[in-house]
From Swiss-Prot:
Keyword field contains Protein biosynthesis: no
Keyword Cell cycle appears in the UniProt entry: yes
Compartments reported by the entry: Cytoplasm
Enzymatic reactions: [protein]-peptidylproline (omega=180) = [protein]-peptidylproline (omega=0)
Name of the protein: Trigger factor
Entry's EC annotation: 5.2.1.8
Organism whose genome encodes this protein: Deinococcus deserti (strain DSM 17065 / CIP 109153 / LMG 22923 / VCD115)
Alphabetically ordered keywords of this record: Cell cycle, Cell division, Chaperone, Cytoplasm, Isomerase, Rotamase
Amino acid sequence: MAELISREGNKVEFKVAVPAAEVNRAYEQVWAGLARDVRVPGFRPGKAPRKVIEGRVGKGYVEQEVRDRLLQVHYPQAARELKLSLVDATIDPQDLNNGKDFTFNVRGETYPEVTLGDWSDLKLEATSPEITDDVLNRTLSDLQERNATFESVDRAIEASDQVTIEEQGEDGGTYPVYLDVAEAHVRDALLGKNKGDTVEITVPAHQHGDHEHAEHTVTVKIMDVKTKQLQELNDEFASSLNFESLDRLRADLRNELQRRAQQEGDNARREEFVAHLTERMQADIPQALLERRREAMMQEIQDDLSRQGVKWSEYETFMKEQGKLDEFMADLSKNAETRVKRDLALEKLAEDLKVQVSDAEFNQTMTMLAQANGLSPEQLSKQLGPNGINSYYASIVRERALQQALAQLSGPQAETVAADQGEQQAEGQEESAEKSEE
């Protein structure tokens, strides 16, 4: 049960009491998981006494697992019960005891008051690209190119050939060069040459990563020359791609292109509508909210660099040396503001449209998301944490509000929310929740 204690401006405080029965159930679930996962010498899996398991993992660990499980469920539920859209929150849990109620206090900030302009008569102008015969034929040509074969020839190198070269020198290697996509200085040096020729390639000064490379010369030997062989567009070509005929390949390809075009048009109309909302909304956005989102986005960038083996300090130094750091930071702040405004507009839209997502619907979506990521619902909940779960719920509400509004609008093409668009939303929800959590 949730009780609102105070609300001043966008700052709120509320108290949540979890019944003893729910606490007992959480304890049982945690003990069941520990009995399954903790291996104790001398006992079969699941047969070790709780006291023995507690001795191995510690009483504090058990209590923390129970506390986390309760918060992951009851904090988001309380926020929904009180109809609070929280930007951020601090949770203060009280003592936890089996067989007794568990209480916790929450202090947080809600989104600021927002007023949206009238959008009911908006005519969306974005359209889906037209799939003409020319578009289809170009796509078929691309398929031919991707499935081309190469045969060795005894003649001078031509513009569409594949050339195998051996770089001379201690660090040299052998590798293929596709002239139709090669850089100009490589292509120009090789055109007209023959197998067995030794060629000097002048590489212009360039920058690679954070290193500057002066102009230099590379000596290579031409080991082989191959000409590109395109398969004829016929039933045999279609069969090589597991289609029964060329007509069937063309039909399936057109359907796929039309599906992508429809999706592109839908996405364009979504962005057009959101841009309309944010441009005309009125809201006093606290600077702290913008700064918090900017910091969250900066953390995302640092995490991404870290996964690539790059330290932020190194990247920052590189940006300074290039004179681009100020521009980078300005763009980051601008993008943070755009994200905040988008969320605020869609939160208000959901409120105006009285959009609701039931606990059953939300739990089903969480289960589907967990399965898509190879996790159990419990693992996903733990990974997201209480704030992340709340943000994930908010993202679902925002998406539903956007779909509902678009369905009401008329334009060059009426909005229909495709099933595959919903699947895309599910794939991106976890990342969205993690970003929104900040």
